[in-house]
């Protein structure tokens, strides 16, 4: 029996099914050690998809995944009660359709309950330590988060 996986993409570039003017371009950013990490996305209604891009000017470390500096597409895989963040190498119009073969990797997300339901999906980035941040995705009455840090190697004692 096949398991269906739903996803909320944060696709780089123009996604033909949404107009930036219709939903408004949104941006979340956080600065860690003078490096600004950004997620740019379009925020449609909570039952639609999120589109945007993930840019990091520094190497990052998520739980079990090192992400070299660069431009990526984020997809939130919402398979039942547990969500995963897929960091995908496809950008621009190539990112309009999710291709798991292009994943750099996936990280687990912690499910949390937002304080109140939202009408539009959104990403937030919040600094949690001098070189660490939390990425949160809120959509309708569900939310998930994962943390990351600047990747300074295995001897980094600031994490």
Positions of PLM-derived features:
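Short charge-dense sequence patches
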Residues: 3, 69-70
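Residue-level recognition of conserved structural "scaffold" positions that shape functional pockets
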Residues: 19-20, 41
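Extended, well-structured beta-strand/loop surface patches
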Residues: 29-69, 75-159
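Bacterial N-terminal signal peptides
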Residues: 9-19
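Aromatic-residue detector
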Residues: 4, 14, 28, 40-41
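Bacterial N-terminal signal peptides that target proteins for export
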Residues: 1-11
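Boundary at the C-terminal end of the N-terminal hydrophobic targeting segment
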Residues: 22-25
